[in-house]
Amino acid sequence: MAKAKFERSKPHVNVGTIGHVDHGKTTLTAAISHVLAKTYGGEAKDFSQIDNAPEERERGITINTSHIEYDTPSRHYAHVDCPGHADYVKNMITGAAQMDGAILVVASTDGPMPQTREHILLSRQVGVPFIIVFMNKCDMVDDAELLELVEMEVRELLSEYDFPGDDLPVIQGSALKALEGEPEWEAKILELAAALDSYIPEPERDIDKPFLMPIEDVFSISGRGTVVTGRVERGIVRVGDEVEIVGIRTTTKTTCTGVEMFRKLLDEGRAGENCGILLRGTKRDDVERGQVLSKPGSINPHTTFESEVYVLSKEEGGRHTPFFKGYRPQFYFRTTDVTGTIELPEGVEMVMPGDNIKMKVTLICPIAMDEGLRFAIREGGRTVGAGVVAKIFA
């Protein structure tokens, strides 16, 4: 079959499988790939290709992940699957694979297990917006009441973590039987694909979000004023737009009087572009690296937040020893390090390299942040952890 060319015209959605070890996440990933390729065209990936996940390094952390792509008539999906539990934890915290929605795989022979709960909690902490449930191995359960019981249990567990447990789609199927080509189970995979299409809304593109550019450098150009440079993270800035300088100091307002890229003057700077922004009436000393330029009112500076953190293992170049409460590392946000103190959850005395942990952080100066912002934890310029802002306090 001819390889379909990448369709730019279709909306692109990022999804992934989550759930307990051996509940069939990778088998389901292979089944989706096969059934959709068979039904709508495209390339099918085998279980072994997906299971043999290549190693990637994201911010110095080694993660094994498999990326596959598939299509429904209305959308193009990029799907990520991880072989090991630790890979999921790292993947979700570093945001190596941002998900617009997740497929929670639960074996109906087991029901929810410890990692099922942990993955749901992580999804909540890192801001995965939508979850669809695939109850797997239903061919091995003869008792309809038992299936109903497992479904209820999963729905309750999701509600416990503030997902709409009563309303989200639950599909009962068998990934293995679908992969073996049994029509009644293949139909369940198509039902899952239809649920992805209808339940996960089309993600807002970066360019449609409010303007934000982390400031990397500040220059003074005689006769013209102050230029800040950086890569536009989201949105568009146009000449004449009012912008705010947020973080580290008191927020100030100014106007963008010029945008340049590769020494050419432009009318606007867009998400993904590296540009220089000329600011009206701003002195060289009024701005510094680590602040952000943003659409007024779209982002605020904060100092205290709850985060979910993965602490690098010794093998990953992290610490060799645990840390305790009162630990004061640097927190690296976007372009700069800020010192902060940590508070560990009640009953937790120390954190070992390789652990993931929820912690409350208080920074010594405010940083422009939203929930979902990723950061690194560093000691003397060396990364020892990765985290995500889960909840802002102040």
Curated annotation (Swiss-Prot):
Which reactions is this enzyme annotated as catalysing? GTP + H2O = GDP + phosphate + H(+)
* Main location, first listed in the record: cytoplasm
Q: Which UniProt keywords apply?
A: Cytoplasm, Elongation factor, GTP-binding, Hydrolase, Magnesium, Metal-binding, Nucleotide-binding, Protein biosynthesis
Region annotated G3 sits at 81-84
Q: Name one GO molecular function term.
A: GTP binding
Q: Which residues bind Mg(2+)?
A: 26
Against InterPro entries, the record matches this protein to:
EF-Tu_GTP-bd, EF-Tu_GTPase, EFTu-like_2, EFTU_2, G_TR_CS, P-loop_NTPase, Small_GTP-bd, T_Tr_GTP-bd_dom
Any idea where the tr-type G domain is? 10-204
Q: What is its EC number?
A: 3.6.5.3
**Subunit structure, briefly?**
Monomer.
Q: Which PANTHER family match?
A: ELONGATION FACTOR TU, MITOCHONDRIAL, ELONGATION FACTOR TU-RELATED
Q: Which family does it belong to?
A: Belongs to the TRAFAC class translation factor GTPase superfamily. Classic translation factor GTPase family. EF-Tu/EF-1A subfamily.
Question: Which protein is depicted?
Answer: Elongation factor Tu 1
Native organism is Shewanella oneidensis (strain ATCC 700550 / JCM 31522 / CIP 106686 / LMG 19005 / NCIMB 14063 / MR-1)
